[in-house]
Amino acid sequence: TVPAMEGTSKGFTDTFDYELYDSPAANDPADGFSFNYGNAPVGDQGQAEEGMAGRPGVTENISFEVDTWRNNDAEQGVNISGLVDGQDVGQLAFTNGVILEDGSRKTGSMEIRWDPSKGATFYSTGLTTNADFTDVDTGAFVGDDGYNFIISARVGGANQDLFIDNLIITAGKPTPA
């Protein structure tokens, strides 16, 4: 958890470097991770690649998700989703595709932005299928300076490693990259 930051109700920009690794000849890579902004309490572990859906007391959230489970599965890929008034808003943006092949290592960076007047932006580099979403409408989602940032991840059967480094979160209206 990154605790609430003043100014995030006006938007934010998040950047970080990542490394994903899957050992060879084991089960498929699993399961994935997400970067979340919402009213989840400090310490909430989230639902990994499913964001914060179904977490007790979480009613407002925007989630930037990377699903690595089941190569070529219909739900595997990168997406933006969220919760508004406790209701799942579904996929706001989605690209289906393989993220991490068995026995491979992916390194790259991610840029995540939310602007209340423009929506959500999610870019990644280094994955087999990258996120490339710009100014996606986030509907009725409203930010709040009291919201926390949660990075949530899980590994099915311990078949994937995730490392995040150089995390920078800047509160305030995002500027284009």
Model-based region annotation:
Residues T1-P174:
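Polar, low-complexity loop segments and adjacent catalytic/binding residues used for recognizing
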